[in-house]
């Protein structure tokens, strides 16, 4: 048996073909959902039927805040991530009750991945999120560290959760650092050396 499984795949043909959300190709949408979310259900269902995961084992999938908030350009991937998180809750109850297996999703900062590079304006979103987050964007390596924590026995009673790993981005409405990008009248928030005092 195994102790943990990571689901980390996502792809949208609509995004790749630059189809807007109000002009989706539905065959492509089905592919988006199948690859990015339904595959998570298939993976868990197969593991359960094979009794492949040890008691208190851990299943983790990578999500994004666009599952719960509107992000222009994220397109049908937002729908896929919302489904992904729902699967974690629904299957998390069944697998937890019957085999004490944990299922969670991690909502990661914008990360410059192959899949992410297909999202229009990803570089600007990456910069904006970094300015908004008090701790800055979480890197891919830091996400891997967090996954290891979620695989470990230290989180044996954490299940059916969507856990934000985004430097605080999801809890910030507007940061001074982001405002300073657009508002040039914030000089009073600079120290004697001209550095912006982030609050």
Features from the language model and the residues they span:
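Short, flexible, mixed-charge acidic loops at enzyme active sites
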Residues: 17-21, 118-122, 176-182
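C-terminal helical subdomain
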Residues: 38, 105, 123-158, 163-167, ...
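Acidic donor-diphosphate engagement hotspot in glycosyltransferases and nucleotidyltransferases
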Residues: 115-116, 142, 174
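Conserved hydrophobic beta-strands of the Rossmann-like cofactor-binding core
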Residues: 2-10
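Hydrophobic structural elements of the Rossmann-like NAD(P)H-binding subdomain
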Residues: 6, 60, 103-106, 116, ...
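Non-catalytic terminal and boundary segments that flank Rossmann-like NAD(P)-dependent oxidoreductase
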Residues: 1, 14, 27, 176-199
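Generic structural signal for alpha-helix termini and adjacent loop/cap motifs
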Residues: 46, 50, 152-156, 174
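Catalytic loop of short-chain dehydrogenase/reductase
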Residues: 10-98, 107-113, 136, 169
């Amino acid at each position: 048996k195994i102790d943990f499984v990571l689901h980390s795949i996502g792809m949208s043909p609509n995004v790749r073909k630059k189809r807007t959300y109000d002009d989706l190709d539905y065959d492509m949408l089905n592919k988006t959902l199948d690859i990015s979310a339904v595959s998570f259900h298939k993976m868990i269902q197969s593991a359960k039927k094979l009794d492949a995961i040890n008691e208190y084992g851990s299943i983790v999938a990578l999500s994004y805040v666009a599952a719960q908030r509107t992000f222009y350009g994220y397109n049908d991937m937002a729908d896929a991530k919302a489904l992904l998180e729902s699967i974690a809750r629904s299957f998390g109850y069944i697998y937890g009750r019957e085999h004490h297996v944990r299922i969670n999703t991690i909502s990661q900062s914008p990360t410059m991945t192959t899949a992410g590079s297909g999202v229009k304006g990803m570089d600007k979103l990456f910069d904006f999120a970094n300015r908004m987050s008090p701790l800055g964007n979480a890197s891919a390596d830091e996400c891997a560290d967090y996954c290891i924590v979620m695989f470990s026995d230290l989180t044996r009673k954490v299940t059916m959760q969507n856990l934000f790993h985004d430097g605080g981005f999801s809890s910030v409405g507007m940061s001074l650092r982001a405002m300073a990008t657009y508002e040039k009248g914030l000089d009073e928030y600079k120290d004697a050396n001209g550095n912006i005092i982030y609050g």
